[in-house]
């Protein structure tokens, strides 16, 4: 099923708490739907984390670009114990190889809750990390390597493909490479219902872009490894249409591959490389 991640690019804690409250107030089945809401936090957001736990948030994404930082695992352990087990799931990342996954597995064993990790660095459709840092790997390569590690080590970690998903075909490929979940921010940015800054012709969206840093107020100035993108309003679709197209594309892709279910298809895609 679909889950939603709430971002942290509002100017104040109060603004972010209002966003969470608005989402919770519009739930038709809170007991079930609250388990599908993730909230993004930074390494300095201890006060904010306590506030969102008080609101009923259970799932935390530690939102840093570099999941290899030693602070990330320590921070995850710290907030879990401070939460008195109110945190039910934690998502780490981002990573581009399997070198850190053993440490993530140790964290799972220590905390005893599901640990997810985002796989993908420099592959996002509004990511400029490659241009700024010179670093990138192919997204399929990253996913496949990490998925192989999870499988061969009988790991309990959950792999989340993050970056480069422009259409349903991209999501299908991510699942085929071994992802169990896929981040879909770029795809759902085309929804009429999504949050954007709107002018007469375009609506803008982006990641850690200069535009977003300016509009988000209070974000420290630094170099940008993201960029904003214009979306012509004539190209926007309803959320229902986007979800229908997504599931239809994935279902057909699974069928073409000779598998009956998405679960069977995950990690069993066959890729032909053209050189």
Tell where the protein language model's regions lie, with residue ranges:
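Active-site entrance/lid segments in N-terminal catalytic domains of soluble metabolic enzymes
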Residues: 1-158, 186-188
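Alpha/beta catalytic cores of nucleotide-metabolism and tRNA/nucleoside-modifying enzymes
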Residues: 112-116, 134-161, 165-275
């Amino acid at each position: 099923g679909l889950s939603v991640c709430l971002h942290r690019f509002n100017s104040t804690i109060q603004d972010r708490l209002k966003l969470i409250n608005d989402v919770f107030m519009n739930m038709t089945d809170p007991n079930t739907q609250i388990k599908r809401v993730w909230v993004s936090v930074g390494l300095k957001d201890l006060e904010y984390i306590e506030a969102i736990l008080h609101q009923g948030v259970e799932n935390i994404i530690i939102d840093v670009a570099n999941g290899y930082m030693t602070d990330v695992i320590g921070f995850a352990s710290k907030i879990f114990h401070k939460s008195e087990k109110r945190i039910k799931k934690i998502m780490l990342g981002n990573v581009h190889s399997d070198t850190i996954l053993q440490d993530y597995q140790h964290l799972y064993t220590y905390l005893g809750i599901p640990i997810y990790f985002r796989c993908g660095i420099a592959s996002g459709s509004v990511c400029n990390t490659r241009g700024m840092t010179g670093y990138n790997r192919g997204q399929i390569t990253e996913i496949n390597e990490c998925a192989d590690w999870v499988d061969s080590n009988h790991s309990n970690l959950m792999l989340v493909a993050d970056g480069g998903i422009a259409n349903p075909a991209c999501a299908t490929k991510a699942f085929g490479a071994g992802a169990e979940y896929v981040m879909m921010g770029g795809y759902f940015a085309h929804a009429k219902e999504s949050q954007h800054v709107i002018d007469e012709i375009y609506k803008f969206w982006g990641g850690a872009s200069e535009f977003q840093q300016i509009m988000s107020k209070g974000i420290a100035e630094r170099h940008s490894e993201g960029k904003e993108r214009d979306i012509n309003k004539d190209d926007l679709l309803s959320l229902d249409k986007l979800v229908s197209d997504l599931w239809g594309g994935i279902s057909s892709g699974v069928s073409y591959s000779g598998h009956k279910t998405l679960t069977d298809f995950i990690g069993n895609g066959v890729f032909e490389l053209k050189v």
